[in-house]
């Protein structure tokens, strides 16, 4: 099975990243021939973006979270 990886930089995204993951999951349900992962990269966001990412990781085994120690732009 082929795999698609979505790598999404996140900055001040605590209120929007969940919707993005939900849209990707809905799209991938229409493509059963592919496995997928969503890699959410918190770019040292000052809000609770990484808290939201942690919740998404706990709820969906397709989601991986990365927390950067400083903003890389």
Could you describe each region identified by the protein language model?
Residues 18, 36, 43-44:
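Glycine/alanine-rich phosphate-binding loops at beta-alpha junctions
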Residues 31-36, 61-62:
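A generic structural motif
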Residues 13-29, 52:
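Short, well-formed alpha-helical segments that are part of the catalytic scaffolds
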Residues 42-50:
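A conserved acidic beta->alpha catalytic loop
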Residues 50-73:
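Conserved donor nucleotide-binding strand/loop of the catalytic core
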Residues 3-5, 37:
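Cell-envelope/extracellular polymer assembly enzymes that use nucleotide-activated donors
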Residues 10-12, 43:
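Aromatic-flanked redox-active Cys/Sec active sites in thiol-based oxidoreductases
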């Amino acid at each position: 099975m082929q795999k698609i990886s979505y790598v999404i930089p996140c900055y001040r995204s605590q209120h929007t990243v969940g919707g993005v993951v939900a849209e990707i999951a809905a799209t991938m349900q229409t493509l059963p021939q592919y496995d997928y992962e969503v890699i959410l990269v918190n770019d040292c966001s000052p809000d609770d973006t990484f808290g939201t990412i942690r919740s998404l990781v706990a709820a969906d085994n397709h989601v991986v979270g990365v927390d950067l120690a400083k903003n890389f732009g």
